[in-house]
């Protein structure tokens, strides 16, 4: 809870509090937290859209592996920064994407925390068919139909609809994050980045060209 509040309100955890947490860890009390409690805190983190900061704080406190051993090392850094008002279910799916090629860890994570079956099923389907879902509009009929079969589309299942809706948000989130990165990089190119011999309109033209040249690195 302390980590969640620190992530939400962006405050520094006092050294005394950090020591208390380390003492609790040393005594093994963290190992006795019930899975339902961990999942409850995680759902609140989803609603607050702060799970990146949340995991980062747990890592800094050296308790991440005690509470969420499946999210090993700095794997949480791969979680895409989300958008506001994204549903809890799709927030969970964003978290699930860090288990790409590590489905066994994802299943262990879900089973240990008693993740709702609906979330687990959707996350597993997305992981198993991530590349095809990303490239869905370019799939040939055979590969599309395979997705329909796997998702139970013809049995009135919403799995395929939910997966494609999530992929839509996933792409939008990635595009937004990439745009923010590009914006920051291009802003660093200014009058100090071009020859001091240039004058007037030449300066603006040179800055523009350097920014265009930089964009080629993103292709």
Indicate residue ranges for each PLM-predicted region.
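Residue-level marker of positions within ordered structural domains that often coincide
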Residues: 47, 63, 132, 197-199
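Glycine- and charge-enriched loop/helix tracts that form the active or gating conduit
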Residues: 1-113
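A diffuse structural propensity rather than consistent per-protein peaks
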Residues: 14-17, 34, 136-143, 190
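Divalent metal-dependent catalytic cores for phosphoryl transfer on phosphate-bearing substrates
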Residues: 67-172
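Short, surface-exposed acidic
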Residues: 13-17, 65-69, 117-123, 200-207
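Short, mixed-charge aromatic SLiMs
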Residues: 22-35, 80-83, 112-133, 179-193
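Charged substrate- and nucleic-acid-binding regions of tRNA-handling and nucleotidyl-transfer enzymes
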Residues: 3-7, 152-219
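A broadly tuned preference for mixed-charge, low-complexity surface segments
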Residues: 9, 19, 42, 49-67, ...
């Amino acid at each position: 809870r302390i980590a969640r509040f620190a992530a939400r309100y962006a405050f520094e955890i006092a050294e005394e509090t950090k020591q208390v947490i380390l003492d609790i860890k040393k005594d093994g009390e963290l190992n006795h937290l019930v899975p339902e409690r961990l999942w409850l805190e995680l759902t609140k983190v989803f609603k607050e859209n702060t799970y990146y900061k949340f995991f980062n704080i747990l890592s800094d406190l050296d308790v991440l592996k005690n509470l969420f051993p499946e999210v090993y090392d700095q794997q949480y850094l791969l979680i895409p920064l989300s958008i506001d008002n994204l549903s809890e279910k799709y927030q969970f799916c964003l978290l699930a994407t860090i288990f790409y090629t590590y489905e066994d860890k994802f299943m262990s994570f879900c089973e240990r925390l008693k993740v709702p079956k609906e979330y687990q099923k959707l996350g597993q389907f997305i992981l198993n068919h991530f590349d095809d879902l990303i490239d869905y509009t370019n799939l040939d009929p055979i590969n599309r139909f395979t997705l329909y079969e796997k998702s139970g589309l013809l049995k009135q299942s919403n799995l395929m609809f939910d997966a494609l809706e999530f992929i839509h948000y996933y792409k939008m989130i990635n595009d937004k994050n990439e745009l923010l990165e590009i914006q920051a990089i291009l802003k660093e190119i200014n009058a100090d980045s071009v020859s001091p011999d240039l004058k007037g309109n030449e300066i603006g033209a040179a800055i523009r060209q350097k920014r265009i040249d930089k964009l080629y690195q993103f292709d």
